[in-house]
Design a protein with these regions (language model features):
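Short beta-strand/loop segment that forms part of the nucleotide-sugar
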Residues: 15, 27-28, 36-45, 61, ...
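A conserved acidic beta->alpha catalytic loop
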Residues: 42-51, 95
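N-proximal low-complexity "stem/linker" segments adjacent to membrane-targeting elements
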Residues: 1-30
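Catalytic donor-sugar/metal-binding loop of nucleotide-sugar-dependent glycosyltransferases
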Residues: 149, 170-173, 182-200
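Acceptor/aglycone-binding surface of glycosyltransferases and processive sugar-polymer synthases
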Residues: 65-82, 99-175, 201-227
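Short beta-strand-to-loop acidic/aromatic patch adjacent to the donor-nucleotide binding site
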Residues: 85-96
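Acidic helix N-cap motif at the loop->helix transition within catalytic regions
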Residues: 22-26, 47-56
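Cell-envelope/extracellular polymer assembly enzymes that use nucleotide-activated donors
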Residues: 10-12, 37, 180
Length: 227
């Protein structure tokens, strides 16, 4: 099957989820409607996240306890590799990301090892001016600390070749994994491109998401604690 001219049979979409029973089924259905294989890793949720994800058509793995988003993503990535994925896409569970952006990310891997989604090259819906200012501050801080020149620091919508997985293995279990990936991309010399994407801040995602201040604090904590 093809989506936007891109073959879907060798790409897996990995979603880490915690307490997302309210939205995860619709998120999974949006992705699977495009012909993509989806694995949802329920990171120890006390609600019906796992069953709702399964109802949406995802392969579901469960952590017995909450280990953090980084750990959940790595669990899903490992499954995708075992299932023979050639390409892997990470996708948020809270409805922020648009499945329509996946084909462009995967297509970008024809000339790159990793494609990072950029909301600042694309569009942002529902974010306040203060949030946007903090997100831009996080980008500036990330670029200073990582030595990279990106337009977006921590967009969770990204694609990479399975061959890049060993170099990008996530060891930061919680939110610092996004900073860890940037450092590993820089150190490994992997070819990276940015792709415009849409990020949608809904009432649900705003209630669950981290603030810009938290993002900057996580950046400093990771880069200075591990340097």
């Amino acid at each position: 099957m093809y989506n936007g001219g891109v073959a879907t049979n060798d790409t897996w979409i990995v979603i880490a989820a915690y307490r997302e029973a309210a939205v995860i089924e619709s998120v999974v259905r949006e992705v699977t409607a495009g012909g993509w294989s989806v694995v949802v890793v329920d990171d120890g949720s006390p609600d019906d996240t796992a069953s709702r994800a399964r109802a949406g058509g995802a392969t579901v793995l469960r952590h017995a306890i909450n280990l953090g988003q980084g750990a959940a993503l790595q669990t899903g990535i490992d499954l995708a590799v075992r299932r023979g994925a050639r390409n892997i896409v990470t996708f948020d569970a809270d409805g922020q990301h648009a499945a329509g952006d996946i084909p462009a990310l995967v297509a970008a891997l024809a000339d790159a090892d990793i494609a990072l989604g950029s909301r600042f090259q694309g569009s942002v819906d529902g974010a306040s001016r203060s949030r946007m200012a903090l997100l831009r501050a996080a980008v500036w801080t990330s670029n200073r600390l990582s030595g990279m020149k990106l337009t977006d620091a921590h967009c969770g919508l990204r694609a990479f070749r399975a061959s890049a997985v060993p170099a990008l293995r996530i060891t930061q279990d919680r939110m610092a994994h996004a900073s860890e990936l940037l450092r590993k991309i820089k150190a490994s010399g992997l070819r990276v491109v940015e792709v415009p994407v849409t990020v949608r801040y809904t009432e649900h995602s705003r209630a669950k998401g981290q603030s810009g201040f938290q993002a900057i604090r996580i950046l400093f904590d990771y880069f200075f604690r591990t340097s």
